[in-house]
Amino acid sequence: MAKLVIVESPAKAKTIGKYLGDDYEVTASMGHIRDLPASQLGIDVEHGYTPQYISIKGKEKLIKELKSKAKHADGVLLATDPDREGEAISWHLANILGLDPHEPNRVTFDEITKKGVKEGMAHPRAIDEDLFNAQQARRVLDRLVGYKLSPFLWRKVRRGLSAGRVQSVAVRLIDDREKEIENFKPDEYWNVDATLGAGHKSFVARLATDANGKKLLPKSEAEARAIEKGLEGASYVVSELKRGKRAKQPTPAFITSTLQQEASRRLGFTATRTMRAAQTLYEGVDIAGHGMMGLITYMRTDSLRISDEAVAAAKEYIAGAYGEAYICPYKRTWKTKSATAAQDAHEAIRPSVPSLTPDEVDKSISGDTAKLYRMIWSRFMASQMADCQQDTVSVTVSAADYHFKASGYTVTFDGFTALYEEATDEKEKKETNLPPLEQGQVLKLRELKSEQKFTQPPARYTEATLIKALEENGIGRPSTYAPIITTIIDRGYVERDQKKLKPTLLGRAVDGLMLEQFPHIVDVDFSAQMEKNLDKVESGKADWRKTVDDFYQGFEASLEQAEKNMEGKKVKVPDEPSSEVCDLCGRPMVIKVGKYGKFLACSGFPECRGTKRLVKDTGGICPKCGKGRLLERKSSKGRIYYGCECYSDCDFMTWDMPVATKCEKCGSTLFRKGGKLYCAKEGCGFEMPVPKKD
């Protein structure tokens, strides 16, 4: 008889089955098989918060099949993912199949390759009860908060709403940022720039200080003009010249959070889209010449550790592709910020076979998986390459009673940047390409220009910056970031506006109520401490039941007080105004949020029940018919697309966003795809890079 190996998915089963051969039967549980009941609390609060698990609806036949296979197998091994959720799935499987959780029937694979599977199978272990209890504690806490708090929101705000231990904090961060933007008062300032000539070349230096070294930043046009007047007839002389060298180091290989952030910035992926592609790469794809294999190590990790074997493989590739000079001459190590012992058991996210290049893989895979593999592979390889070496120069130019400054650098050795550089959300400080200069050199003033500027409010969060904020504040865990963002958007608390996350009126109303009645639930520091307590459960330093009880006692008291405070009261969510008029009665229409998203409703409801689909005019004109306006719409799955308003006669649609810039060749609306703008008019073919912002 063969041994039975149970994993989560058919794809993973297929890949592992290839390596194990005929002595093993590999089958899939299709994810979780048991959970808390959907229709009731399912937790015995009076008896140690004991969860009352039931089989998930629709899994009865699968469970029966698994029991039959286990009964006739020569042993059972549980090979679910090496994390909290995977441990929980294995615990429930052991429970249903009658396996002793203390026996060595649990195996894990950090990478699904021949080597990784062999390594995992050689080290079976008992189920990690601390890891399972950490998952169980989170599940129980989330159920208690959701099940107790959601009905309160239904009564006081609107039916169908939900609140969560972590999602509510995420909404608060987004709402707090919106308040900062609304309350921001811009300050005027002026930049004074001198374009200076040195021989046939010129460069720009900016006013920095007065003669005494006091920083100068004119606050008005009058101040700027006074400085210009003081510079009339002045000589511009190089008064200080500093030369130096600097080394720029690569960023480490990805962890879950940085993978999600970089995929958002570089590829435009949502966190959910990133993790879906990463799961596919981990579980296995069919690669020409290799068959089914996992292309990356496990993608839910907080660890920056890289195995010596992987480092050696990377350096071997770098030497062959770039030369010995491009290999980092020492062993790079990065300190893992906050990983628990269980999390640090994994490596960082890296290619499972470093010598397998993206170009070779691209012959077998495409789309999101190909793009993500290229990014993971490049980042890992770059992390083992030599520093980028730069010569730096900074110059101070004195004129009358003022000092101007400029700085620049020259790359003397590209190092890791020959392969990869991290994308960034912040605008980098501009550095000028300076001509050769000497101390005491007199420069020619070519232009003196003053430009009005205003301080800018903080930017709205993107998925990347929200994930970064959640991580920095210790809110949630990287594996939960994708579902958190999906949930707050699906619930109508937050919406995407040009990749920025903006709170809706509903989201702001709910956040205000939560802040007023349950301040600890949405308190960032409280939530971070809760995560630390749960990490202690995972590392065996705290009892999960006591951790839950410590939270629940305070939460229950807050809920009782909130019911008293809000007795007879209800929070009114203001309707969002629109420019549309009701076709039935002529009253203005307002934007409401329903089960399937936003729609237009007559402000005269309930006297008038007029409704319309909500569409947004992009300002662009259809490139196909040349007449209809381009409208923003949503697919049945909630994805935004753009189509012609004359949809009964014109079938033009695209996922790519129209922009204000017009085609230089034919004058049509341009569309953005990645880093380029293109014209969609048949026969035109015009393309251009996306213009850079100052």
Please report, for each region that a protein language model flagged, where it lies by residue:
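Intrinsically disordered, low-complexity regulatory segments
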Residues: 1-139, 148, 209, 218-221, ...
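A short, conserved structural fragment
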Residues: 282-297, 491-500
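Short, hydrophobic-biased segments on the C-terminal half of alpha helices
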Residues: 275-279, 485-486
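Metal- or metallocofactor-binding catalytic centers and their adjacent structured scaffolds
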Residues: 215-252, 441
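Basic, low-complexity terminal or inter-domain segments flanking catalytic cores
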Residues: 2-4, 15, 150, 160, ...
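Structured, non-catalytic alpha/beta "coupling" segments that mediate domain-domain communication
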Residues: 14-37, 168-215, 383-432, 588
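C-terminal or mid-to-C-terminal helical accessory/interaction module adjacent to the motor/catalytic core
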Residues: 112-194, 244
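Short acidic, hydrophobic short linear motifs in intrinsically disordered regions
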Residues: 238-241, 250-263, 290-299, 457-469
